[in-house]
Amino acid sequence: MASSYKMSEQSTTSEHILQKTCDHLILTNRSGLETDSVAEEMKQTVEGQGHTVHWAALLILAVIIPTIGGNILVILAVALEKRLQYATNYFLMSLAIADLLVGLFVMPIALLTIMFEAIWPLPLALCPAWLFLDVLFSTASIMHLCAISLDRYIAIKKPIQANQCNSRATAFIKITVVWLISIGIAIPVPIKGIETDVINPHNVTCELTKDRFGSFMVFGSLAAFFAPLTIMVVTYFLTIHTLQKKAYLVKNKPPQRLTRWTVPTVFLREDSSFSSPEKVAMLDGSHRDKILPNSSDETLMRRMSSVGKRSAQTISNEQRASKALGVVFFLFLLMWCPFFITNLTLALCDSCNQTTLKTLLEIFVWIGYVSSGVNPLIYTLFNKTFREAFGRYITCNYRATKSVKALRKFSSTLCFGNSMVENSKFFTKHGIRNGINPAMYQSPMRLRSSTIQSSSIILLDTLLTENDGDKAEEQVSYI
Protein backbone atom coordinates (compact mmCIF):
# COMPACT_ATOMS: atom_id res chain seq x y z
CA MET A 1 0.00 0.00 0.00
CA ALA A 2 2.78 2.31 0.98
CA SER A 3 4.72 1.19 -2.06
CA SER A 4 1.69 1.85 -4.27
CA TYR A 5 1.26 5.32 -2.74
CA LYS A 6 4.92 6.18 -3.38
CA MET A 7 4.67 5.07 -7.01
CA SER A 8 1.51 7.14 -7.47
CA GLU A 9 3.18 10.21 -5.94
CA GLN A 10 6.23 9.83 -8.18
CA SER A 11 3.96 9.50 -11.24
CA THR A 12 2.04 12.66 -10.29
CA THR A 13 5.27 14.57 -9.77
CA SER A 14 6.60 13.46 -13.15
CA GLU A 15 3.40 14.49 -14.89
CA HIS A 16 3.50 17.88 -13.18
CA ILE A 17 7.09 18.47 -14.26
CA LEU A 18 6.26 17.40 -17.81
CA GLN A 19 3.24 19.73 -17.90
CA LYS A 20 5.29 22.69 -16.69
CA THR A 21 7.94 21.92 -19.26
CA CYS A 22 5.35 21.84 -22.06
CA ASP A 23 3.77 25.08 -20.87
CA HIS A 24 7.17 26.74 -20.79
CA LEU A 25 7.94 25.58 -24.31
CA ILE A 26 4.57 26.84 -25.57
CA LEU A 27 5.02 30.23 -23.91
CA THR A 28 8.55 30.50 -25.24
CA ASN A 29 7.41 29.67 -28.76
CA ARG A 30 4.52 32.16 -28.57
CA SER A 31 6.84 34.86 -27.25
CA GLY A 32 9.23 34.16 -30.08
CA LEU A 33 6.43 34.46 -32.63
CA GLU A 34 5.27 37.76 -31.10
CA THR A 35 8.85 39.05 -31.08
CA ASP A 36 9.27 38.13 -34.73
CA SER A 37 5.97 39.84 -35.54
CA VAL A 38 6.98 43.05 -33.76
CA ALA A 39 10.36 43.01 -35.44
CA GLU A 40 8.71 42.55 -38.83
CA GLU A 41 6.36 45.46 -38.18
CA MET A 42 9.26 47.65 -37.08
CA LYS A 43 11.18 46.66 -40.18
CA GLN A 44 8.26 47.56 -42.43
CA THR A 45 7.83 50.89 -40.65
CA VAL A 46 11.50 51.74 -41.03
CA GLU A 47 11.41 50.74 -44.69
CA GLY A 48 8.31 52.89 -45.22
CA GLN A 49 10.00 55.87 -43.57
CA GLY A 50 13.08 55.24 -45.65
CA HIS A 51 11.04 55.30 -48.86
CA THR A 52 9.40 58.55 -47.73
CA VAL A 53 12.78 60.14 -47.01
CA HIS A 54 14.12 59.04 -50.40
CA TRP A 55 11.02 60.41 -52.13
CA ALA A 56 11.38 63.72 -50.29
CA ALA A 57 15.08 63.99 -51.11
CA LEU A 58 14.35 63.30 -54.77
CA LEU A 59 11.74 66.04 -54.93
CA ILE A 60 14.02 68.50 -53.15
CA LEU A 61 16.97 67.85 -55.45
CA ALA A 62 15.08 67.49 -58.71
CA VAL A 63 12.38 70.17 -58.38
CA ILE A 64 12.67 72.58 -55.47
CA ILE A 65 16.36 73.53 -55.58
CA PRO A 66 16.52 74.12 -59.38
CA THR A 67 13.31 76.16 -59.19
CA ILE A 68 14.68 78.45 -56.50
CA GLY A 69 18.16 78.73 -58.01
CA GLY A 70 17.08 79.28 -61.61
CA ASN A 71 14.57 82.00 -60.80
CA ILE A 72 17.01 83.82 -58.53
CA LEU A 73 19.45 83.94 -61.46
CA VAL A 74 16.77 85.46 -63.71
CA ILE A 75 15.90 88.13 -61.13
CA LEU A 76 19.57 89.01 -60.62
CA ALA A 77 20.20 89.22 -64.36
CA VAL A 78 17.37 91.68 -65.02
CA ALA A 79 18.19 93.71 -61.90
CA LEU A 80 21.96 94.00 -62.52
CA GLU A 81 22.42 93.89 -66.29
CA LYS A 82 21.71 97.25 -67.95
CA ARG A 83 21.36 95.54 -71.33
CA LEU A 84 18.42 93.50 -70.01
CA GLN A 85 16.49 96.33 -68.40
CA TYR A 86 13.72 96.89 -70.92
CA ALA A 87 9.97 96.43 -70.76
CA THR A 88 9.68 92.84 -71.99
CA ASN A 89 12.22 91.54 -69.51
CA TYR A 90 10.34 93.12 -66.61
CA PHE A 91 7.58 90.64 -67.42
CA LEU A 92 10.19 87.88 -67.18
CA MET A 93 11.37 89.22 -63.85
CA SER A 94 7.83 89.23 -62.45
CA LEU A 95 7.29 85.70 -63.78
CA ALA A 96 10.51 84.61 -62.07
CA ILE A 97 9.31 86.16 -58.80
CA ALA A 98 6.05 84.19 -58.99
CA ASP A 99 7.92 80.95 -59.74
CA LEU A 100 10.44 81.67 -56.98
CA LEU A 101 7.62 82.10 -54.45
CA VAL A 102 6.20 78.75 -55.57
CA GLY A 103 9.57 77.17 -54.80
CA LEU A 104 9.93 78.91 -51.44
CA PHE A 105 6.46 78.72 -49.89
CA VAL A 106 4.38 76.17 -51.78
CA MET A 107 6.63 73.25 -52.71
CA PRO A 108 8.29 72.69 -49.28
CA ILE A 109 4.94 72.53 -47.46
CA ALA A 110 3.50 70.25 -50.14
CA LEU A 111 6.51 68.01 -49.61
CA LEU A 112 5.88 68.10 -45.85
CA THR A 113 2.33 66.83 -46.33
CA ILE A 114 3.69 63.93 -48.38
CA MET A 115 6.06 62.97 -45.58
CA PHE A 116 3.16 63.04 -43.06
CA GLU A 117 0.93 60.97 -45.36
CA ALA A 118 -1.39 63.86 -46.32
CA ILE A 119 -2.03 64.87 -42.69
CA TRP A 120 -1.59 68.63 -42.14
CA PRO A 121 1.41 68.91 -39.76
CA LEU A 122 1.30 72.68 -39.19
CA PRO A 123 -1.13 74.87 -37.21
CA LEU A 124 -4.61 74.64 -38.67
CA ALA A 125 -4.85 78.40 -39.28
CA LEU A 126 -2.01 78.17 -41.83
CA CYS A 127 -3.86 75.72 -44.06
CA PRO A 128 -6.12 78.27 -45.85
CA ALA A 129 -3.16 80.63 -46.19
CA TRP A 130 -1.04 77.93 -47.84
CA LEU A 131 -3.86 76.95 -50.20
CA PHE A 132 -4.31 80.62 -51.12
CA LEU A 133 -0.60 81.04 -51.89
CA ASP A 134 -0.61 77.82 -53.89
CA VAL A 135 -3.48 78.98 -56.10
CA LEU A 136 -2.17 82.57 -56.29
CA PHE A 137 1.42 81.88 -57.35
CA SER A 138 0.54 79.07 -59.75
CA THR A 139 -2.15 81.23 -61.36
CA ALA A 140 0.22 84.20 -61.55
CA SER A 141 2.80 82.05 -63.34
CA ILE A 142 0.22 80.99 -65.93
CA MET A 143 -1.12 84.54 -66.33
CA HIS A 144 2.38 85.88 -66.96
CA LEU A 145 2.83 83.40 -69.81
CA CYS A 146 -0.47 84.56 -71.26
CA ALA A 147 0.44 88.25 -70.93
CA ILE A 148 3.84 87.69 -72.56
CA SER A 149 2.26 85.96 -75.54
CA LEU A 150 -0.28 88.79 -75.96
CA ASP A 151 2.38 91.48 -75.60
CA ARG A 152 4.61 89.77 -78.13
CA TYR A 153 1.84 89.42 -80.71
CA ILE A 154 0.88 93.10 -80.42
CA ALA A 155 4.54 94.12 -80.75
CA ILE A 156 4.88 92.11 -83.98
CA LYS A 157 1.50 93.06 -85.41
CA LYS A 158 1.68 96.79 -84.64
CA PRO A 159 5.30 97.58 -83.78
CA ILE A 160 5.01 101.37 -83.96
CA GLN A 161 2.00 101.64 -81.65
CA ALA A 162 3.43 99.02 -79.31
CA ASN A 163 6.79 100.78 -79.12
CA GLN A 164 5.09 104.04 -78.19
CA CYS A 165 3.59 102.32 -75.13
CA ASN A 166 6.63 100.18 -74.38
CA SER A 167 7.88 102.14 -71.38
CA ARG A 168 8.87 100.91 -67.95
CA ALA A 169 5.79 102.46 -66.35
CA THR A 170 3.49 100.75 -68.85
CA ALA A 171 5.18 97.41 -68.22
CA PHE A 172 4.70 97.80 -64.46
CA ILE A 173 1.03 98.63 -64.98
CA LYS A 174 0.56 95.46 -67.04
CA ILE A 175 2.37 93.40 -64.42
CA THR A 176 0.16 94.87 -61.68
CA VAL A 177 -2.95 93.93 -63.65
CA VAL A 178 -1.67 90.35 -63.99
CA TRP A 179 -1.15 90.06 -60.22
CA LEU A 180 -4.56 91.61 -59.46
CA ILE A 181 -6.27 89.09 -61.74
CA SER A 182 -4.41 86.25 -60.01
CA ILE A 183 -5.42 87.54 -56.57
CA GLY A 184 -9.04 87.82 -57.70
CA ILE A 185 -9.05 84.18 -58.80
CA ALA A 186 -7.43 82.88 -55.59
CA ILE A 187 -9.21 85.04 -52.99
CA PRO A 188 -12.25 82.70 -52.46
CA VAL A 189 -9.98 80.14 -50.78
CA PRO A 190 -9.16 82.09 -47.58
CA ILE A 191 -12.66 83.61 -47.51
CA LYS A 192 -14.42 80.25 -47.36
CA GLY A 193 -11.73 78.50 -45.31
CA ILE A 194 -11.57 74.75 -44.74
CA GLU A 195 -13.94 72.42 -42.95
CA THR A 196 -12.48 71.20 -39.64
CA ASP A 197 -13.18 67.77 -38.17
CA VAL A 198 -14.56 68.59 -34.69
CA ILE A 199 -14.12 65.04 -33.38
CA ASN A 200 -10.46 64.80 -34.35
CA PRO A 201 -9.10 68.25 -35.24
CA HIS A 202 -5.53 66.92 -35.43
CA ASN A 203 -6.38 64.53 -38.26
CA VAL A 204 -7.03 67.13 -40.98
CA THR A 205 -5.99 67.01 -44.63
CA CYS A 206 -5.35 70.45 -46.12
CA GLU A 207 -7.05 70.26 -49.51
CA LEU A 208 -9.91 71.74 -51.50
CA THR A 209 -12.82 69.36 -50.98
CA LYS A 210 -15.56 68.88 -53.54
CA ASP A 211 -18.36 69.55 -51.06
CA ARG A 212 -17.01 72.93 -49.97
CA PHE A 213 -15.08 74.13 -53.04
CA GLY A 214 -16.80 72.31 -55.91
CA SER A 215 -17.92 75.48 -57.69
CA PHE A 216 -14.55 77.14 -57.09
CA MET A 217 -12.73 74.16 -58.58
CA VAL A 218 -14.73 74.59 -61.80
CA PHE A 219 -14.35 78.38 -61.87
CA GLY A 220 -10.66 78.26 -60.97
CA SER A 221 -9.85 75.69 -63.63
CA LEU A 222 -11.61 77.71 -66.33
CA ALA A 223 -10.25 81.12 -65.30
CA ALA A 224 -6.73 80.11 -64.30
CA PHE A 225 -5.96 77.63 -67.07
CA PHE A 226 -8.39 77.05 -69.91
CA ALA A 227 -9.04 80.75 -70.66
CA PRO A 228 -5.32 81.69 -70.68
CA LEU A 229 -4.60 78.55 -72.68
CA THR A 230 -7.08 79.60 -75.36
CA ILE A 231 -5.54 83.08 -75.54
CA MET A 232 -2.01 81.69 -75.80
CA VAL A 233 -2.87 79.22 -78.56
CA VAL A 234 -4.71 81.86 -80.63
CA THR A 235 -2.00 84.50 -80.23
CA TYR A 236 0.74 81.98 -80.99
CA PHE A 237 -0.78 80.99 -84.33
CA LEU A 238 -1.51 84.63 -85.15
CA THR A 239 2.11 85.49 -84.36
CA ILE A 240 3.40 82.73 -86.62
CA HIS A 241 1.05 83.85 -89.41
CA THR A 242 2.15 87.49 -89.09
CA LEU A 243 5.84 86.59 -89.16
CA GLN A 244 5.40 84.36 -92.19
CA LYS A 245 3.57 87.15 -93.98
CA LYS A 246 6.32 89.68 -93.18
CA ALA A 247 9.03 87.24 -94.22
CA TYR A 248 7.25 86.66 -97.53
CA LEU A 249 6.99 90.41 -98.19
CA VAL A 250 10.66 91.00 -97.40
CA LYS A 251 11.79 88.03 -99.49
CA ASN A 252 9.73 88.99 -102.54
CA LYS A 253 10.28 92.73 -102.30
CA PRO A 254 11.96 93.98 -105.51
CA PRO A 255 15.46 95.34 -104.93
CA GLN A 256 15.67 99.11 -104.77
CA ARG A 257 18.68 101.21 -105.42
CA LEU A 258 19.06 103.62 -102.55
CA THR A 259 19.92 107.13 -103.57
CA ARG A 260 20.46 110.24 -101.60
CA TRP A 261 16.90 111.37 -102.41
CA THR A 262 15.19 108.25 -101.02
CA VAL A 263 16.23 108.90 -97.44
CA PRO A 264 13.40 110.84 -95.77
CA THR A 265 15.09 111.50 -92.45
CA VAL A 266 18.66 111.33 -91.18
CA PHE A 267 20.56 112.43 -88.13
CA LEU A 268 23.06 115.10 -89.04
CA ARG A 269 26.34 116.00 -87.45
CA GLU A 270 27.07 119.46 -86.24
CA ASP A 271 28.53 121.37 -89.16
CA SER A 272 30.17 124.76 -89.13
CA SER A 273 28.51 125.68 -92.42
CA PHE A 274 25.15 126.01 -90.65
CA SER A 275 24.24 128.87 -88.42
CA SER A 276 22.67 126.52 -85.85
CA PRO A 277 23.48 122.80 -85.44
CA GLU A 278 20.69 120.49 -86.61
CA LYS A 279 20.36 117.04 -85.06
CA VAL A 280 17.41 115.92 -87.15
CA ALA A 281 16.40 117.47 -90.47
CA MET A 282 13.56 116.65 -92.80
CA LEU A 283 14.72 116.49 -96.36
CA ASP A 284 12.83 118.57 -98.83
CA GLY A 285 13.56 119.81 -102.31
CA SER A 286 14.94 123.16 -101.24
CA HIS A 287 17.55 121.92 -98.74
CA ARG A 288 18.74 118.56 -100.01
CA ASP A 289 22.00 119.79 -101.45
CA LYS A 290 22.81 121.66 -98.25
CA ILE A 291 21.99 118.91 -95.83
CA LEU A 292 23.81 116.08 -97.52
CA PRO A 293 27.19 117.19 -98.82
CA ASN A 294 28.45 115.27 -101.81
CA SER A 295 31.52 114.04 -99.95
CA SER A 296 29.40 111.90 -97.64
CA ASP A 297 27.03 110.42 -100.24
CA GLU A 298 28.89 107.15 -100.76
CA THR A 299 29.31 106.52 -97.04
CA LEU A 300 25.65 107.26 -96.43
CA MET A 301 24.47 104.98 -99.21
CA ARG A 302 26.63 102.12 -97.95
CA ARG A 303 25.11 102.49 -94.52
CA MET A 304 21.57 102.68 -95.84
CA SER A 305 22.02 99.60 -98.03
CA SER A 306 22.13 97.44 -94.92
CA VAL A 307 18.59 98.38 -93.82
CA GLY A 308 16.94 95.71 -95.95
CA LYS A 309 19.35 93.05 -94.68
CA ARG A 310 18.63 94.03 -91.10
CA SER A 311 14.89 93.75 -91.70
CA ALA A 312 15.29 90.20 -92.96
CA GLN A 313 17.59 89.36 -90.06
CA THR A 314 15.10 90.79 -87.57
CA ILE A 315 12.26 88.70 -88.99
CA SER A 316 14.48 85.62 -88.90
CA ASN A 317 15.25 86.28 -85.23
CA GLU A 318 11.56 86.77 -84.49
CA GLN A 319 10.78 83.44 -86.13
CA ARG A 320 13.39 81.71 -84.00
CA ALA A 321 11.96 83.40 -80.92
CA SER A 322 8.49 82.18 -81.88
CA LYS A 323 9.79 78.63 -82.12
CA ALA A 324 11.16 78.99 -78.61
CA LEU A 325 7.76 80.30 -77.57
CA GLY A 326 6.22 77.19 -79.11
CA VAL A 327 8.46 75.03 -76.92
CA VAL A 328 7.25 76.97 -73.88
CA PHE A 329 3.60 76.46 -74.80
CA PHE A 330 4.12 72.76 -75.43
CA LEU A 331 5.75 72.28 -72.02
CA PHE A 332 3.04 74.41 -70.43
CA LEU A 333 0.36 72.12 -71.88
CA LEU A 334 2.29 69.01 -70.97
CA MET A 335 2.77 70.01 -67.34
CA TRP A 336 -0.52 71.70 -66.40
CA CYS A 337 -3.12 69.96 -68.55
CA PRO A 338 -3.21 66.70 -66.51
CA PHE A 339 -3.80 68.55 -63.23
CA PHE A 340 -6.57 70.86 -64.42
CA ILE A 341 -8.37 68.17 -66.41
CA THR A 342 -8.32 65.89 -63.35
CA ASN A 343 -9.37 68.77 -61.10
CA LEU A 344 -12.33 69.56 -63.36
CA THR A 345 -13.28 65.87 -63.55
CA LEU A 346 -13.20 65.59 -59.76
CA ALA A 347 -15.57 68.55 -59.42
CA LEU A 348 -18.06 67.51 -62.11
CA CYS A 349 -18.05 63.70 -62.13
CA ASP A 350 -20.07 62.21 -59.24
CA SER A 351 -19.77 58.62 -60.41
CA CYS A 352 -15.98 58.68 -60.72
CA ASN A 353 -13.70 57.12 -58.13
CA GLN A 354 -12.89 60.05 -55.85
CA THR A 355 -9.95 58.32 -54.16
CA THR A 356 -8.24 57.60 -57.46
CA LEU A 357 -8.76 61.15 -58.70
CA LYS A 358 -7.32 62.63 -55.50
CA THR A 359 -4.26 60.39 -55.81
CA LEU A 360 -3.78 61.54 -59.40
CA LEU A 361 -4.09 65.17 -58.31
CA GLU A 362 -1.27 64.71 -55.80
CA ILE A 363 0.96 63.46 -58.61
CA PHE A 364 -0.10 65.92 -61.30
CA VAL A 365 0.28 68.98 -59.09
CA TRP A 366 4.01 68.25 -58.79
CA ILE A 367 4.26 68.00 -62.57
CA GLY A 368 2.71 71.46 -62.66
CA TYR A 369 5.22 72.70 -60.09
CA VAL A 370 8.02 71.59 -62.41
CA SER A 371 6.80 74.27 -64.84
CA SER A 372 7.99 76.92 -62.38
CA GLY A 373 11.50 75.52 -62.64
CA VAL A 374 11.43 75.11 -66.42
CA ASN A 375 10.21 78.63 -67.24
CA PRO A 376 13.51 80.45 -66.55
CA LEU A 377 15.47 77.86 -68.52
CA ILE A 378 13.31 78.00 -71.64
CA TYR A 379 12.85 81.76 -71.69
CA THR A 380 16.42 82.77 -70.96
CA LEU A 381 18.76 80.13 -72.35
CA PHE A 382 17.77 81.27 -75.84
CA ASN A 383 19.29 84.67 -75.02
CA LYS A 384 23.06 85.07 -75.08
CA THR A 385 23.08 87.95 -72.60
CA PHE A 386 21.22 85.87 -70.01
CA ARG A 387 23.59 82.94 -70.51
CA GLU A 388 26.66 85.12 -70.00
CA ALA A 389 25.15 86.67 -66.87
CA PHE A 390 24.24 83.26 -65.44
CA GLY A 391 27.79 82.03 -65.98
CA ARG A 392 29.20 84.96 -64.02
CA TYR A 393 26.65 84.73 -61.21
CA ILE A 394 27.28 81.03 -60.66
CA THR A 395 30.94 81.88 -60.03
CA CYS A 396 29.86 84.69 -57.65
CA ASN A 397 30.96 87.40 -60.08
CA TYR A 398 28.23 90.05 -60.01
CA ARG A 399 30.17 92.83 -61.74
CA ALA A 400 29.83 93.78 -65.36
CA THR A 401 32.40 92.36 -67.75
CA LYS A 402 35.34 94.41 -68.94
CA SER A 403 33.83 94.94 -72.36
CA VAL A 404 30.56 96.23 -70.88
CA LYS A 405 32.39 98.66 -68.59
CA ALA A 406 34.50 99.86 -71.49
CA LEU A 407 31.39 100.26 -73.59
CA ARG A 408 29.85 102.55 -70.97
CA LYS A 409 33.08 104.55 -70.84
CA PHE A 410 33.21 104.99 -74.59
CA SER A 411 29.53 105.86 -74.71
CA SER A 412 30.23 108.78 -72.39
CA THR A 413 33.38 109.74 -74.33
CA LEU A 414 31.77 109.80 -77.77
CA CYS A 415 29.92 113.09 -78.11
CA PHE A 416 27.14 114.36 -80.27
CA GLY A 417 29.20 117.24 -81.55
CA ASN A 418 31.64 114.97 -83.33
CA SER A 419 30.96 113.75 -86.81
CA MET A 420 30.16 110.12 -87.52
CA VAL A 421 33.55 109.71 -89.17
CA GLU A 422 35.36 111.08 -86.10
CA ASN A 423 33.41 108.84 -83.72
CA SER A 424 34.05 105.84 -85.96
CA LYS A 425 37.79 106.51 -85.97
CA PHE A 426 37.82 106.88 -82.19
CA PHE A 427 35.92 103.63 -81.75
CA THR A 428 38.13 101.73 -84.19
CA LYS A 429 41.25 102.94 -82.37
CA HIS A 430 40.14 102.28 -78.79
CA GLY A 431 37.10 100.04 -78.85
CA ILE A 432 38.48 96.83 -80.32
CA ARG A 433 41.53 97.04 -78.05
CA ASN A 434 39.27 97.01 -74.98
CA GLY A 435 37.22 94.03 -76.05
CA ILE A 436 34.22 95.83 -77.54
CA ASN A 437 33.01 94.29 -80.75
CA PRO A 438 30.99 96.31 -83.25
CA ALA A 439 27.83 94.39 -82.42
CA MET A 440 27.90 95.77 -78.88
CA TYR A 441 28.31 99.40 -79.90
CA GLN A 442 25.45 101.86 -79.98
CA SER A 443 25.73 105.45 -81.10
CA PRO A 444 25.44 108.24 -78.53
CA MET A 445 22.23 109.39 -80.20
CA ARG A 446 20.59 106.02 -79.53
CA LEU A 447 21.89 105.91 -75.99
CA ARG A 448 20.56 109.38 -75.30
CA SER A 449 17.20 109.46 -77.01
CA SER A 450 14.36 106.99 -77.29
CA THR A 451 13.64 105.28 -80.55
CA ILE A 452 11.97 107.58 -83.05
CA GLN A 453 8.43 106.37 -83.63
CA SER A 454 8.00 106.54 -87.39
CA SER A 455 8.41 104.02 -90.15
CA SER A 456 9.90 106.74 -92.37
CA ILE A 457 12.67 107.60 -89.92
CA ILE A 458 16.02 105.87 -90.14
CA LEU A 459 18.54 106.10 -87.35
CA LEU A 460 22.12 106.16 -88.60
CA ASP A 461 24.33 104.42 -86.08
CA THR A 462 28.00 105.20 -85.97
CA LEU A 463 28.91 101.64 -86.88
CA LEU A 464 26.51 99.54 -88.96
CA THR A 465 28.69 98.12 -91.69
CA GLU A 466 30.19 94.71 -91.01
CA ASN A 467 28.37 93.07 -88.10
CA ASP A 468 24.79 94.03 -88.85
CA GLY A 469 23.39 90.56 -88.36
CA ASP A 470 24.98 90.16 -84.95
CA LYS A 471 23.75 93.59 -83.87
CA ALA A 472 20.20 92.85 -84.87
CA GLU A 473 20.32 89.51 -83.13
CA GLU A 474 21.54 91.14 -79.93
CA GLN A 475 18.82 93.80 -80.00
CA VAL A 476 15.87 91.49 -80.72
CA SER A 477 14.17 90.09 -77.65
CA TYR A 478 13.88 86.33 -77.56
CA ILE A 479 10.79 86.37 -75.39
UniProtKB/Swiss-Prot annotation:
Disulfide bonds: 127-206, 349-352
Superkingdom of the source species: Eukaryota
GO BP term (any one): phospholipase C-activating serotonin receptor signaling pathway
Tissue: Ubiquitous. Detected in intestine, heart, skeletal muscle, testis, urinary bladder, stomach, liver, lung, brain and kidney. Detected in osteoblasts. Detected in the raphe nucleus in the brain, in dorsal root ganglion neurons, the brain stem, cerebellum and spinal cord. Detected in interstitial cells of Cajal in the small intestine.
Extracellular face residues: 1-55, 113-128, 192-215, 345-359
Residue numbers covered by motif NPxxY motif: 375-379
Membrane topology: Multi-pass membrane protein
Family, as annotated: Belongs to the G-protein coupled receptor 1 family.
The name this protein goes by in its record: 5-hydroxytryptamine receptor 2B
